[in-house]
Amino acid sequence: MAPNQRPKVVITGASRGIGRGCARAFGTQGAEVVLVARNLDELQRAVDEIVSEGGCASAVACDVTNAEEVRSLFGGLERCDVLINNAGMNRPQPFLDVDLATLDELLSLNVRSMFIAAQAAARLMARQHSGVIINMSSQMGHVGAANRSVYCTTKHAIEGLTKALAVELAPLGIRVNAVAPTYVETPLTRPFLENEAFRGEVLQRIPLGRIGTVAEVVAAVMFLASPAASLITGTSLLVDGGYTAQ
């Protein structure tokens, strides 16, 4: 990267929640942020927010489960310094009731799309001999849980992908890590956390006794993307209030 050049940061799932929080944080710190999601209207509102605060941002409508769209997106970039691989979803179901449509949808979005985005970004980063990839995992990538067989499968896969890429891409100057949050107040989790019984059960499992915030997850992402983490690769930073320590 040339002196005084803004680092280019690509964030998938950037229209809301953790992705949007990351976009705003990178934007306020001087990065050129490319926000990626399917809903262009929501993306544009996020871009407008960043620009109004003096940041540099653009929106790209892209279905990350479509390999050609993802490759076209990265093919149109001159460089990529950081990829925040954040798009994902959850659909809790008892294991005996899991239908193939749910299995395929979560594998496609939570695993396949992240693999393809990481590959496309890494091809750019390899030319630069530098770059950072951060995969959004979950505490469920470290444990098991009832009604989350598919989600746990996908997040354990992301933990494995992170380690494999860290080893393979290190000689190319590319660091790869994961961030693994506990339950965080986002549009994705809100329907579950509004159930008082479920919320109480969750809080009982978290030693620090509270739900996480977007800002706390964003802080972990910003650290792993920063020079302060220059010797860190192949790890998963748990932001879970002690959930997995038990």
What function would you assign to each model-found segment?
Residues 96, 143-149, 171-172, 209, ...:
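Active-site loop immediately N-terminal to the catalytic Tyr-X3-Lys motif
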Residues 115-118, 175, 210-239, 243-245:
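C-terminal substrate-recognition "lid" of short-chain dehydrogenase/reductases
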Residues 118, 154, 162:
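Active-site helix of classical SDR
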Residues 15-17:
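Conserved glycine-rich cofactor-binding loop
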Residues 123, 167-171, 230:
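Alpha-helical segment proximal to the catalytic Tyr-Lys
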Residues 94-95, 99-107, 202:
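Substrate-binding pocket helix/loop in short-chain dehydrogenase/reductase
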